[in-house]
């Protein structure tokens, strides 16, 4: 495996582990019901902080996923070095596929922003 792949997998594992730790912290704070107002306010602040960090970590995972998809798609469309004449029909098909792909990506991003 390439060093880039290993470091990417380590980063993903690290992000997932951190998300699990943050969720665990949130659930641990919810267990004891007999707490003073001061402790509840401190735990509420800590819980809000954990939630914000979880959201940011999930955004990092989404970014990694998107980058991998872009690399996969762009590497699958290789252009040869030869002088090759494209037929207009082939060009139209390629543009149609590319436009469809960008529309789906934009639709996906719009759906993600609504949530």
Swiss-Prot record:
Keywords, alphabetical: Activator, Nucleus, Transcription, Transcription regulation
Any one GO cellular component localisation term in the record: mediator complex
Compartments, record wording: Nucleus
Molecular function in Gene Ontology: transcription coregulator activity
Keyword match Kinase: no
Gene Ontology biological process terms from the UniProt entry: regulation of transcription by RNA polymerase II
Main location: nucleus
Record's function text: Component of the Mediator complex, a coactivator involved in the regulated transcription of nearly all RNA polymerase II-dependent genes. Mediator functions as a bridge to convey information from gene-specific regulatory proteins to the basal RNA polymerase II transcription machinery. Mediator is recruited to promoters by direct interactions with regulatory proteins and serves as a scaffold for the assembly of a functional preinitiation complex with RNA polymerase II and the general transcription factors.
Subunit structure: Component of the Mediator complex.
Sequence similarity: Belongs to the Mediator complex subunit 22 family.
Protein name per Swiss-Prot or TrEMBL: Mediator of RNA polymerase II transcription subunit 22
Organism encoding this protein: Candida albicans (strain SC5314 / ATCC MYA-2876) (Yeast)
Gene: SRB6
